[in-house]
Amino acid sequence: MRRCARVRGRIVISLLASAIAAVSGTPAQAYLKLGLRDSVGSVSLRWTTQPAHYSVNDRDVSGVSSEQLRQAIERAFRTWEDVPTASVRFQFDGFTSAEPLEDDNTSTFGFLSRPDLDRVLASTSFFVDTRTGEILESDVFFNSSVPWSVTQNGEPGRFDLESIALHEAGHFLGLSHSALGETEPRSGGGRRVLGAGAVMFPIAFASGNVEGRRLFPDDIAGVSDIYPDAGFRQDTGSVQGRVTKDGDGIFGAHVVAYDPRTGDLVGNFALEETGEFIIAGLRPGTHILRVEPLDDAEIESFFDRPSLDVDFQPTFYERLVVVPRGGGTPSIEIPVRAR
């Protein structure tokens, strides 16, 4: 039995359907960890004991049985467990009649009919210890008002359950959204995903697509940062610094490290008012840094604030950055100019 006499708060993260979502991304953003901030500081959300236990609701829906849902979730969790630089484990505790979003000290996956949330494919919520960031309970619901597929190659007009489960499992672990992806406007409104560089991109691929069943370097760096294996800190490095405009820091600017040897993109946002950032989990060696504004997305998909300073030009850092093994670079400053 988990301890319940703690300060608890609920956080909800939703995944949007590509066909009607109003969110878009740019091709160089990076993983963002879920966290809480108060007057003292901030904490990241994570499971402090493993395996993380979960149950699956026993209700079938059109086209998907509860057993098929369990199998899709199991495959999604296995994909995260297979990350060689992270240490995560999950334990299925059986089927339950309880539904997601019940405050019952049980993490439950299942379907809910939410036709009012016509943009939402799935949603993950948490109860957490707001002092430490420990995840106490996490529920995930898949919207049964949209059509789902569990076939190996996907089905036209139906969203791939395993792909969406993989995204929600990332939230379950404490990852927030990445904006590493490209979209284009749709004639009927919203945006269409052209390509995603992270499973944690907040807009799903179109129905019938199964490309979202694999992790990207951005996802791998994120989960390894939260749950590092024994050698992760020693075998990787980090880059740190500030993003400034006219001498002032820019909160929410995102800095991306590009590895020219592999083509991998990994990064993080400037998460302090001073514009300070740190990008962890980088392969040692030369990287190219680029800063871009979050000017083509709904801010609320990434941050709990109504606005950010996005009035600056995308900027490359003037020098190549050499990331050391098992350590960090000296702090650098990346000045940007207003548009």
List the predicted regions and their residue ranges.
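N-terminal secretory signal peptides that target proteins for export/translocation
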Residues: 1-8
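Bacterial N-terminal signal peptides
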Residues: 12-23
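Metzincin-family zinc-dependent endopeptidase catalytic domain
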Residues: 31-34, 69-193, 254-258, 268-284, ...
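Fold-level signature of zinc-dependent metallopeptidase catalytic domains
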Residues: 36-74
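Extracellular beta-sheet/turn segments enriched in Thr/Pro/Gly and aliphatic residues
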Residues: 135, 221-228, 309-339
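Beta-strand-rich domain onsets/edges
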Residues: 209-237, 245
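A short, amphipathic beta-strand motif
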Residues: 237-245, 275, 334
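Structural motif
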Residues: 242-253, 258-261, 324
